A protein has these predicted regions:
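Short amphipathic alpha-helix adjacent to the substrate-entry channel of hydrolases
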Residues: 81-98
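Catalytic nucleophile-loop/oxyanion-hole region of alpha/beta-hydrolase
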Residues: 88, 102-138
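Short beta-strand element of the alpha/beta-hydrolase
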Residues: 64-72
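N-terminal cap/lid segment of alpha/beta-hydrolase-fold proteins
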Residues: 19-62
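Short beta-to-alpha linker loops that shape the active-site pocket of alpha/beta-hydrolase fold enzymes
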Residues: 73, 100-104, 172
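Short, hydrophobic alpha-helix immediately C-terminal to the catalytic nucleophile
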Residues: 83, 87, 124, 128, ...
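Alpha/beta-hydrolase-fold enzymes
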Residues: 138-201
């Protein structure tokens, strides 16, 4: 499992200007994926009144695990960073699953509520859904979905044997502290406006 993750990851070098500037640049200048394969849609029942739409890029190398990508707050399966990573993984032969959290992306309007930092049951249902279709999954959660992924793994549930690895990218492990930093940083007005616009859309 760890060797597999090591092969996927390069040494991280932060952008000049720190994390805030990197977040802004990544969202405002998304670039174009080099590889845009056909995506197969999946409709997943999360609750009686909630559905999620996820998309699958089929594997070229059937011996490799399928990788599930979970977006951060205000994002969706169409977010630039999700598509860039999916494109790179697809070029390496991996099957890729691009999920949308409850009320996000293509699932907007299909739920009576929105996802939050405690939505581990939604993630569990998506994992179970895809494990019925793929024998081995590797999970990658970004930002708030990274926090949900850690919550899913640490709740004492029985972890399915087909789940062979998990990677949490920049998770706000302490949501209260993360909220305080975003709210009090000198650039907080910019982040609040940016996220409120994303959530409102």
């Amino acid at each position: 499992m760890f060797l597999e993750i090591d092969r996927l990851m390069n040494t991280f070098v932060p952008a000049p200007g720190g994390a805030f500037l990197q977040t802004i640049i990544g969202s405002q200048f998304p670039g174009k994926p080099k590889f845009l394969p056909e995506k197969i849609p999946h409709t997943i029942d999360l609750d009686v009144d909630a559905k999620s739409i996820a998309f699958e890029i089929q594997a070229v190398d059937k011996d490799k695990p399928t990788i599930l990508l979970a977006h951060g707050m205000g994002g969706c399966s169409e977010s630039g960073y999700i598509k860039r990573i999916a494109a790179k993984l697809g070029l390496q032969g991996y099957g890729v699953l691009l999920i949308n959290q409850r009320g996000s992306g293509s699932g907007m309007g299909l739920s009576s509520s929105l996802w939050n930092g405690g939505s581990s049951e939604d993630l569990a249902k998506m994992i179970d859904y895809f494990l019925m279709r793929h024998p081995h999954l590797l999970l990658i959660g970004f930002s708030l979905s990274g926090n949900i992924l850690l919550k899913y793994l640490g709740e004492g549930r029985s972890i399915p044997p087909g789940l062979i690895g998990a990677l949490s990218v920049n998770p706000p492990v302490d949501l209260r502290v993360a909220s305080h930093i975003i709210s009090t940083h000198r650039s907080s007005w910019l982040f609040n406006r940016y996220y409120m616009r994303l959530i409102g859309n």
